[in-house]
Swiss-Prot record:
Keywords: DNA-binding, Transcription, Transcription regulation. Disulfide bonds: none annotated. Residues 18-37 bind DNA. The keyword Acetylation does not apply. Residues 7-61 form the HTH cro/C1-type domain. Residues 1-22 are annotated as: Disordered. The keyword Transcription applies. Pfam families: HTH_3 (PF01381). Residues 1-12 have a biased composition (Basic and acidic residues). CDD domains: HTH_XRE. This is HTH-type transcriptional regulator ImmR.
Amino acid sequence: MSLGKRLKEARQKAGYTQKEAAEKLNIGNNNLSNYERDYRDPDTDTLLKLSNLYNVSTDYLLGKDEVSKKNETDLLNKTINEAIQELKDEDTLLFMNDGEFDEETARLVKKALKNGIKFIDELKKKE
């Protein structure tokens, strides 16, 4: 599979339109389209940004690795950070003071995350 096809597939799996991905990457929609159609290859910095946005390895995009996922820690960190950002954007984290946690809140968030992950593990075992 070509780089362009892998880019398009990774973008679609990540749930982005070309326009949305281009905006997040701060590149023109035409540039992204050219990458996906194999008219041009992205430079190294852009390839890394694409990899991070789509949560795939650069090796996967370049066809050196058939596994599209980065390691589980990267995915977990990304998921947690996105969830916190979404909550901030929704003004849900009312317990934050100027965007910062106090020590007690940080401890409670950590405990909630650990319990949530344990719960997910138990659900997976039952499947």
